[in-house]
Amino acid sequence: MNRLAIYCGSATPADPVYIETARAVGQGLAARGIGVVYGGGRLGLMGAVADSALAAGGEVIGVIPEALVGSEVAHRGCTELHVVAGMHERKRLFTDLSDGFITIPGGVGTMDELWEAIS
């Protein structure tokens, strides 16, 4: 297994256990030589996964819709950052670039990505 897609929220949850879990996921994957493919954000759980994987020397590939790049939420420190036209292309690229997926808490967008991956 080379890379896993991580589906998670861009918000910072009230309970810090979720941030700790996101960091553990990123660090754990990097320690095993497994790259991270994720939503490309620098905030919330997304940012925690990316930052911890990068800090551990891991590969982090962000996939972010063009509309979100303009609002300055894109993580500029990713190994690769793919800017795509919209959510459909984002979900397709998640599938193309990864060998499996992990879902950690998020909102409606996370659930949408999860169901797309399952189907």
Role assignments for model-derived ranges:
Residues M1-L97:
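A cross-family phosphate/adenosyl-ligand binding-site feature
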Residues V84-D96, G100-S119:
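Conserved phosphate- and dinucleotide-binding cores of soluble alpha/beta proteins
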